Structures are given as structure tokens and as C-alpha cells.
Amino acid sequence: MSLASGPSSKLLLFSLGMGLVSGSKCPNKCVCQDQEVACIDLHLTEYPADIPLNTRRLYLNNNKITSLPALQLGFLSDLVYLDCQNNRIREVMDYTFIGIFRLIYLDLSSNNLTSISPFSFSVLTNLVRLNISHNPHLLYLDKYVFANTTSLRYLDLRNTGLHIIDHNGFHHLVVLQTLYLSGNPWICNCSFLDFTIHLLVSHMDHPDAQNATCTEPAELKGWPITKVGNPLQYMCITHLDQQDYIFLLLIGFCIFAAGTVAAWLTGVCAVLYQNALRTSSGDDTEDETGSRFANQIFRSNTHLGPIRRFPELI
């Protein structure tokens, strides 16, 4: 009897088939056990292949990975924990995590992130902890980045290149409890006022509040951003500097000068118009007087009767 027809061979084929379906193969040099895959300190430059499809916890930290492929990640529909810290990931594209909507924990800290697309986290409605700290080239966060992460409770933004942030981006984070903001070059100008007010009224925990300070302007350098609300409000809403008064004075003078010139031009135009009217009426009067004089002569001749003719000599 051949191996292909025996019961043991059928069992082997069935086991192999189940293995392919469940994706039980483990990536080279990684450690796989109990739905957990650890590919740590392996100097990987790419996302590893052959990750089991039933993986729930994936550790890719301390490698040289430059990007996260949405297609391969999308097969891990049961993934709840993803650690990618200390890699070389440069950007997170729209819908990178579209297939792992059950994700609860995401760590992208200590990478080379320069941008995060507005819809990068759009499907991560179950995300509870997000760490994107220590990305010094990350200068900007779109206000829609956190629009759908409504379950987020922990957010770490330490030591990035962020210097300004839109307070509207935090309106959807209604359950956010802990926010780290230190180590960023915050520019505390009037555009920053709304965010400082949000920090005060949201009652979030800021464990590093004393180290989250302003770098500009000079008069607010070193101020904790959680305490800079009142000085900013004074500077931006109720306070006028000497330069502001000079500017207002110049505006007032320009308005006065423009009004004076406009009034003078109006007066000149009115005088010229009146003179033109008078000249026109004078000409009309002379024409009317001449007409009357001619009519009087004609009438006087009419009263004298018919004009006598001299007798004809021949």
C-alpha cells in the first residue's frame, strides 16, 4: 500500500493543511509560542515573513525595519499588541493598520518618523495605548490623526519635533487619561492658546508637566505649558504693547488724512460743478433775452401796418 493511500498519510496531509490555514509557521530566528511572536534584536531590515495568522502579540522592537506593509499586517486580524519601538520606520501611511482593527497597544517610539498620515489610525477604534515618542523628525500632527481613536487612554508624545499642535485634534479623545508632552520645542504663541486652555479644562494627567515647557517666545521660555494659559491670554487678548499703540496711531492718522483729502476733493468737485451750472444757465439766459428782443421788434413792425411800397417809375 502506498503512503498516499494510507490513513497516516491522510492525517499528515490534513495537519499540513491546517497548518497552512492557521499560519503556524514561525519566521526565521524568531520565537513563537502561545499566539505570541518575538523578533527582537535580529537586525531585521524588513517586516518578517511567515508570521502565524493567529498571532495576538507581535514584538518587532530593536531592529532596522523601515516600513510596515499594510497587506501583511492585514492578515493578522487577531492582533492586539504590536511593539515596533527602536526601528527605522520613516512614515505611517493611510490605512497601514486597516486589517488589525482589534489592536489595543501600539508602540512606534524611537523611530525615524517624519509624518503620520491623517487616516493612519482610522480603523483603530479599540486602541488604548499609543506611543510615538522619541521621533525627533516628527514636526506635525494632522488634526484628524486621532479622530477615530476614541478608546485611547494613554498617549505619549515626548521628545518629538512637535512645536505646535491643533487642539481640535484632541476633541475626540474623550476618555484620554494620560498625556506626555515633555522634550518638545513648544512655541507658546497665540496659536497655542487654545491648546493650553484644553489642557486645563480636560483634567488629564500630565506626569511630565514640569518638563513640558515653552521654548519661544523669550518672555515665556521655560514656562510649563500647563501654566502658560493666563500669560498667553494677557498677551494675545487683553494686552497691547508699545508697538501696537504706534500701529493704531498710524492707522488713525492715515484714516484722518484720507478723510481730509476725500472731503477736499468732494468740495472741489462741488465748486466746479456749480460753476459749470452757472455758466450753462448764463448762456441760456442770453439766448432767451435775444429771442425776446427779436420778438419785440417783429411785433412793433406788425403794429405799424403793411409796409408801404415806393411807386414804380416804370
Swiss-Prot record:
Disruption phenotype: Knockout Kcnu1 male mice exhibit severely impaired fertility. Activation of Kcnu1 currents in sperm lacking Lrrc52 requires more positive voltages and higher pH than for wild-type sperm. It comes from the Eukaryota. Keywords: Cell membrane, Disulfide bond, Glycoprotein, Ion channel, Ion transport, Leucine-rich repeat, Membrane, Repeat, Signal, Transmembrane, Transmembrane helix, Transport. Residues 266-314 are cytoplasmic. It holds the Pfam family LRR_8. Auxiliary protein of the large-conductance, voltage and calcium-activated potassium channel (BK alpha). Modulates gating properties by producing a marked shift in the BK channel's voltage dependence of activation in the hyperpolarizing direction, and in the absence of calcium. KCNU1 channel auxiliary protein. Modulates KCNU1 gating properties, shifting KCNU1 gating to more negative potentials at a given pH. This is Leucine-rich repeat-containing protein 52. It comes from Mus musculus. The lineage of its organism: Eukaryota, Metazoa, Chordata, Craniata, Vertebrata.
